[in-house]
Design a protein with these regions (language model features):
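Membrane-interfacial, low-structure loops and terminal tails that flank and connect transmembrane helices
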Residues: 13-29, 173-189
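Membrane-interface helix caps and helix-loop-helix hairpins in membrane proteins
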Residues: 138-150
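N-terminal signal-anchor transmembrane alpha helix
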Residues: 31-58
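Hydrophobic alpha-helical transmembrane segments
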Residues: 89-112, 129, 133
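Single conserved hydrophobic/aromatic residue that forms the stacking wall/gate
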Residues: 1-9
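Membrane-interface loop-to-helix entry segments
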Residues: 79-101, 148-160
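Juxtamembrane boundary at the C-terminal end of a transmembrane helix
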Residues: 203-214
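Extracytosolic (periplasmic/ER-lumenal) interhelical loops and adjacent juxtamembrane/interface segments
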Residues: 55-90
Length: 214
């Protein structure tokens, strides 16, 4: 006996597939928002600690900080360099002002809030600026200063997660409408880029400071 699938039979199947796809998409968006929250939390914690340490150094520039582990890992060495305060105040103060906004956005997204495109584009540009600034600070520490700050590295990791999570969320929600980027995210290449950047940074640190930190 031959059975044929009628339009009436196909509708429930189509509806089920849409629900499954919608559920999968929702989970991806929630994960992206969670990564924004984790990155913002790490960055805010690092900014808070660095702000306290900058006040300690303001009182005594020769103070030994808790994260002064050795010559290679020294917060005070980095903090006493001009690049730690190019605007006239510690860079960590910028994090204290901006990262609570990212925390709020992440919590709101996890709760199901929807923001207008202009707002999310503003957040995206902020994440790009933050990542570029973090990259510049890492370059200065790695090349110019010749020492690394553990809490600065924590802040860098947080900014990388914020940029990754926010970009992924905006692409999935069509805030950033670009077919190429959508395919890039759907195929997981953005995750590969994130892992590659993290691996390259770790290898660069080990190549230069490995003997001093291991």
């Amino acid at each position: 006996e031959i059975y044929t699938l009628s339009l009436h039979d196909a509708l429930p199947i189509s509806s089920l597939l849409r629900k499954r796809l919608s559920g999968k998409e929702s989970k991806r968006q929630q994960l992206a928002a969670l990564l924004i929250l984790v990155g913002s939390g790490l960055g805010l914690l690092a900014s808070f600690v660095l702000s306290i340490e900058s006040l300690t150094l303001a009182k005594n520039s020769h103070a030994v900080l808790n994260c002064d582990l050795n010559a290679a890992m020294s917060c005070s060495t980095v903090a006493n360099h001009w690049s730690a305060a190019p605007l006239g105040f510690p860079n960590s103060f910028i994090g204290m002002m901006t990262l609570p906004v990212m925390v709020t956005i992440a919590v709101a997204l996890l709760a199901g809030a929807k923001f207008p495109k202009w707002f999310m584009w503003g957040a995206q540009l902020g994440a790009v600026a933050g990542l570029l600034f973090a990259g510049w600070m890492f370059y200065m520490s790695y090349v110019e200063i010749g020492a690394l700050c553990p809490w600065c590295l924590t802040l860098d990791a947080g900014m990388l997660l914020i940029f990754y999570g926010l970009t992924r969320h905006n692409v999935l929600n069509k805030i950033i409408e670009h077919r190429g980027l959508r395919r890039f995210v759907d195929q997981g290449y953005d995750t590969l880029v994130l892992a590659s950047v993290a691996a390259l940074v770790i290898m660069a640190i080990l190549a230069k400071f490995g003997s001093q930190i291991i």
